[in-house]
Amino acid sequence: MPAAKRAKKATRAKKSTKAAIPAATKKILLVDDDAEIIESMRTILEAKGYTVMVARDGSQGIAVAERENPDLVILDTMMPKRSGFLVLEKLRREYGHPIHIIMVTANEVNRHRAYAEMLGVDDYIRKPFAMERLLESVQKLLA
C-alpha cells in the first residue's frame, strides 16, 4: 500500500477514535423530582461513563446548569418551584453555550410536546420509557 494511502487510513482511524470521545468527558444534568427515576437514569448513565449531576427541582436545575456547564440536560416537565418548560425556556434564552436538552414527561398532551419543540427541546420522551430509548437519545446528541 502506498505511503499516502496508509497515512490517509491512519488519519481516518484517528478521526473515528476521536469521534468516540469517552463518555466520561461529557457531563449530564438530571433535573427531576422523582428520586426513583433519577437513580435509574443515574445508574445507567454512570455505567456508560458519563459524569452525572442531579437537581431535584427547576430552580436548582438552573443553578446547577449555570455553575457546572453540562453538555446535556435531562429535564422533567412537572416539578416543584419551576416547571421543566420554564427551565427549558430560560436555558435556551440565557445559557452561555450550546446545550442539548431532553424532556421526559408522564403527560400525554400533544400540545405540551409542541410547546417543548417550539422552545427548542432536542428530544421529548414520554414516561414510562425504556432506558435504552433514553440512552440512544443521549448518545446521539452527544456524538
Feature roles, as predicted:
Residues 38, 80-81, 109:
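The feature encodes the CheY-like receiver
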Residues 57-60, 83-87:
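Acidic catalytic/metal-coordinating carboxylates
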Residues 34, 77-78:
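The short loop immediately C-terminal to the conserved phospho-acceptor aspartate in CheY-like receiver
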Residues 68-74:
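Active-site beta3 strand of CheY-like receiver
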Residues 129-139:
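C-terminal output helix
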Residues 39-47:
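Charged docking surfaces used in two-component/phosphorelay signaling
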